């Protein structure tokens, strides 16, 4: 399953619905939670054990965040990568 998370803060209820093996893309203001020095970094580290996490490059750029500032293990993708993920995942949940 693919989860698209759009806003910050990210509710605990959303995180509880992410199963092992799911893929998660952070978009829009949700990218603000991905900083390696942020308060959310421990939660991200736990998710990364069983899930692949992605962030849209354009959303980082708009907010002045570089890939070097992200929690290790988060993959930066472009719109083509997002399309590939939507095609490869039969079920998609959008959280906004």
Segments from the language model and where they lie:
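Histidine-anchored nucleotide/phosphate-binding helix
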Residues: 4, 8-24
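Active-site-adjacent betaalpha module
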Residues: 4-8, 50, 84-85, 93-94
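Structural motif
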Residues: 5-8, 28, 57-58, 96
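Short, conserved loop/helix-junction motifs that constitute active-site signature segments
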Residues: 17-20, 43-50
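A short beta-strand-loop structural module common to alpha/beta enzyme folds
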Residues: 23-34
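Charged helix-capping and loop-helix junction motifs
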Residues: 38-42
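Conserved phosphate/oxyanion-binding catalytic-loop motifs
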Residues: 54-55, 59-65
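C-terminal structural segments of small proteins and small subunits
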Residues: 66-96
């Amino acid at each position: 399953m693919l989860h698209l998370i759009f806003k910050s803060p990210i509710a605990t209820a959303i995180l509880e619905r992410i199963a092992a093996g799911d893929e998660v893309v952070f978009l829009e203001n949700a990218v603000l939670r991905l900083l390696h020095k942020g308060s959310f970094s421990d939660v991200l580290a736990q998710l990364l054990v069983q899930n692949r996490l992605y962030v849209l490059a354009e959303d980082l750029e708009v907010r002045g965040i570089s890939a070097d500032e992200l929690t290790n293990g988060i993959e930066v993708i472009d719109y083509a990568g997002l399309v590939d993920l939507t095609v490869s995942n039969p079920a998609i949940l959008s959280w906004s």
